Regions:
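C-terminal beta-strand-rich structural cap/linker in extracellular carbohydrate-active enzymes
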Residues: 519-535
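Loop/helix patches that line or flank the sugar-binding groove of alpha-linked glycan CAZymes
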Residues: 5-6, 225, 232, 239, ...
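Aromatic-lined glycan-binding groove of carbohydrate-active enzymes
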Residues: 189, 292-313
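Acidic/aromatic-lined carbohydrate-recognition and catalytic surfaces
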Residues: 2-177, 181, 185, 196-251, ...
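Active-site clefts of carbohydrate-active enzymes
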Residues: 202-203, 304-325
């Protein structure tokens, strides 16, 4: 495998609205991010994945773009963006842009022209039909919206203010490639591609994901934009299998560097149930099965794994699969050790490195997320109690990830001098960056150590993965390179568990426990986790 910079990189996702506010308006901004680059450099990350900062009416927090080549005024100016890129480069931190090209805002100039002038070439940039079919929006209800002016319906797989683009239109595709080159020329390090598996859709057959033209479009995009550039490109692909992931990320196919697959995230939900029916506990044997499949089937010559627990759409992992009560610190470290020593590129979501938790939402008035609000109204109409709905939002709602970053124990957690757009988690007095940096045993320093290991040890990139037989609640695996093996053992429970057989430990590489005592007793205390080099 030809080594690329992203093979031993660690990416840090910033959700700009919630990261750091520099001007007191309660909304995070680009200058705020730039002001915290020294902190991210201390953590050791290679690149920032920046959620959208483009011009937008903010119907879906920036994933509804009205101008791809301008910056939303709430985040700052193009000069602020250029400063962030330049200051990142000084610290060897690349900026990866969020590319949202399945849809635009209904306030984009293309859609305004398409709507007002049905004979315009821009009309065909979107998907119009005389009658709707059965496609359902990801945000509830029909994905078709009637436009009275023209008497036709347009497709929106998300909000009605996010009309889907028609990728069959060649002129549209080349506008998108020109826009990507605009950002590449500004010195960015790559693109995270939002719901990219939807661009090949065939609406008349109700095929939304993985349509037949998806991969030809991505090959064309590759050739027109990043082919000869050393850029990281990662696609969001909810329905991917290892075979599908290889189509995207096999270097011979000349498409993307890697994809986000969500099979493990599916364990957060009850089998066969919609998203809001969350699973009461983690099915650890199933988690082992899923990770092992992806680690072994996505071979290094044919593809590459993205490793993540959190993003801006998902609840906090320490609350979902950790124990954010008695074992918050230890379980957060355990989950980090489990993930970061696998094969692939790890992604950290802001606040994960200090163990930020889900928010204790009490009423619907506390909620900002359009998906959660739409679901709540739909569920209330069906007779679901508000108590049940609020419990679901506390466990699954996207706002859990979007509460402001907790910098210190001062007012509003040091995020803003004003009133934050979304309430700060009340636990910020205990859980904040300042406290983490002052405590040598904090979660932060475990993440810092894991990132340093990835830079120091080539085997983390290249070694094979082997699942090790262990108790149901214990996830153990080896990374094997030639004669040398490294063992990772993690107790994914708040109960004592049996230690799997360990022969000949030469060195402890990282742990959240006293490994010698564990080896002597043969017992794993709750959330024990370690990696050792075997003799």
């Amino acid at each position: 495998m030809e080594q690329k910079w992203w093979h031993n990189a660690v990416i840090y996702q910033v959700y700009p609205k919630s990261f750091k506010d520099s001007n007191g308006d309660g909304i995070g901004d680009l200058k705020g991010i730039t002001s915290k680059l020294d902190y991210l450099e201390k953590l050791g990350i290679t690149a920032i994945w920046l959620s959208p900062v483009y011009k937008s009416p903010m119907d879906d927090n920036g994933y509804d773009i009205s101008d791809y080549e301008d910056i939303a005024s709430i985040f700052g100016t193009m000069e602020d963006m250029e400063e962030l890129i330049a200051e990142g480069q000084k610290r060897k931190i690349k900026i990866i842009m969020d590319l949202v090209v399945n849809h635009t805002s209904d306030e984009h100039a293309w859609f305004i022209e398409a709507r007002e002038h049905p004979d315009s070439p821009k009309r065909d940039f979107y998907i119009w039909r005389d009658e709707p079919n059965g496609i359902i929006s990801a945000f509830s209800g029909s994905a078709w919206e009637f436009d009275e002016a023209s008497g036709q319906y347009y497709l929106h797989n998300f909000s009605k203010k996010q009309p889907d683009l028609n990728w069959e239109n060649e002129e549209l595709r080349h506008h998108i490639y020109d826009m990507m080159n605009f950002w590449i020329d500004k010195g960015i390090g790559g693109f995270r591609m939002d719901v990219i598996d939807m661009i090949g859709k065939i609406p008349d057959q109700e095929i939304i994901s993985n349509g037949p033209m998806l991969h030809p479009y991505l090959k064309e995009m590759n050739q027109a934009t990043f082919r000869d550039k050393d850029l990281l490109t990662v696609g969001e692909t909810w329905g991917a299998t290892p075979e599908i992931a290889k189509q995207y990320s096999n270097p011979k196919n000349q498409e993307l560097s890697m994809v986000f697959q969500f099979e493990h995230i599916g364990l957060q939900y009850q089998p066969g149930q919609p998203k809001w029916h969350y699973a009461k506990e983690l099915d650890v044997p199933k988690l082992k099965e899923i990770f092992t499949k992806w680690q072994t089937e996505l071979g290094e010559e044919e593809g590459w794994n993205s490793l993540f627990w959190n993003n801006h759409d998902l609840p906090r992992i320490v609350s979902t699969w950790g124990d954010d009560g008695n074992y918050r610190v230890k379980s957060a470290k355990a989950l980090a050790i489990l993930l970061h020593l696998m094969k692939g590129t790890p992604y950290i979501y802001q606040g994960e490195e200090i163990g930020m938790t889900n928010y204790p939402f009490k009423t619907l008035e506390d909620v900002e997320d359009i998906e959660s609000i739409n679901y709540a109204h739909e569920a209330l109409e069906k007779g679901v109690s508000l108590e049940v709905i609020m419990d679901q939002i506390r466990h699954i709602g996207r706002d859990n990830a979007r509460t402001p970053m907790q910098w210190n124990d001062e007012a509003e957690a040091g995020f803003t001098t004003g009133r934050p757009w979304l309430a700060v988690n009340p636990n910020y007095k205990e859980i904040n960056v300042e406290a983490a940096l002052a405590d040598p045993d904090s979660i932060f320093y475990t993440y810092q150590a894991l990132i340093a290991l990835r830079k120091e040890y080539p085997w983390l990139v290249t070694a094979d993965y082997e699942l090790v037989d262990a108790a149901d609640k214990v996830f153990a695996y080896k990374r094997v390179e030639g004669e040398q093996a490294y063992l990772v053992v993690v107790n994914l429970s708040s109960q004592e568990q049996e230690l799997p057989l360990v022969n000949g430990v030469e060195e402890v590489l990282i742990a959240n426990t006293k490994v010698e005592q564990v080896l002597e007793s043969g017992k794993l205390a709750p959330w024990d986790a370690f990696c050792v080099k075997l003799a």
